[in-house]
């Protein structure tokens, strides 16, 4: 067998040939592996496991799904690891799956040793591995060449039911996932079909790019840092898909070298990466939206699993090592053309553009498309061009359950964790005015422009005009002190962007609905 050519000594113009010659699996070899794996699948489907310890007496496998590289069609040549997810009849909820996960693994482990078909394939090294979640791992051999294959089995709750494999599940599925309060990724196997299909139904050329990135990662990152806590291959796959979607607008005809260089460039800037999709879950549901918004506020890099909003597949890994290796890769022949010029990369933003809904009292709302990494001063320029304001713009936003925050012109939306559709409030002030926030009993708040020397009564008049609560029924507090109508804001030390608490005076009518 010829020695494999080094990627780093392959010119960029030859990358397509490199993938075809060295990375694309041979059909005969792939079929031989899958033939052995089919024996495992048949065992799982046909065997009835005897349940104990609170499980159903008759535990059956409802469905077996190949996941990972063999499942999504991006397997590399000579890959000997196959992952299977077994959906079981005894799991009726995420909570049950978590409670009985290890019991089921023991049942399968015990029964496998009694299967003559598996023993004929040289079943050995059968063990339970601690993962997220735990899995059953063992080795079998192919029938023809006796090549060893490592197979992983993960039992799972069939949360999606018999729904169409690439359609958006009902929001209730994700609501129950979020309420189950499992650790990140604990219930990912329940969504493995969606994870697989997210990659599987992609153009052939993109799969070539995925193979190239995975080969680089295995040979030049993982192999050289075997003990480091490195990101999973799935994270690299998702990053590559994002680069292709944004860089080519999902064009099936692209230059492989440009795609590869783009992924390396993105890896250099891992600290600002924030990626998510809404293919399978929608942000129109309040519980799902809250879950995703909380994820997007975390430390980057953020690559949310498109099938599981509770899992950031990029969290907690040594991306700095990956970035170092990417920097080295960009200096190699595979990233230079025949004239020794560096290959250009696609223009890929580190986060998707988002919609901002701008609200202002007395004016209809309007929408802007901005990038989270744009400076807020540029957002204000867009507002000025749209509405023609000449005064000082004060922008603020509020997340449910939190205080209203002023958006500083020197920062970006990303600084405030804003990476999805958000409503912001516009207040136009003149130089002598400050902005104050008034928090209602329901937790919502409004922004008001007022001269710091104005009386408290003047602010109450604005509140009455905007919210309908008469001045006489209002009670305002600042830092625990009730504010008197005929004293100025400055007397109380109220400064720009401070928050006042609004309540109803005792014995008054209910607070008007907003």
From Swiss-Prot:
N-acetylalanine modifications at: 2
GO molecular function: DNA binding; double-stranded RNA binding; nuclear thyroid hormone receptor binding; nucleotidyltransferase activity; RNA binding
Keyword Nucleus attributed: yes
Tissue-specific expression: Expressed in most tissues, with the highest levels in primary blood Leukocytes and other hematopoietic system tissues, colon, stomach and to some extent in testis.
Domain of life (superkingdom): Eukaryota
The keyword Repeat is assigned to this record: yes
PANTHER family: 2'-5'-OLIGOADENYLATE SYNTHASE-LIKE PROTEIN, 2-5 OLIGOADENYLATE SYNTHETASE
Biological function: Does not have 2'-5'-OAS activity, but can bind double-stranded RNA. Displays antiviral activity against encephalomyocarditis virus (EMCV) and hepatitis C virus (HCV) via an alternative antiviral pathway independent of RNase L.
Protein name from the UniProt record: 2'-5'-oligoadenylate synthase-like protein
Phylogenetic lineage: Eukaryota, Metazoa, Chordata, Craniata, Vertebrata
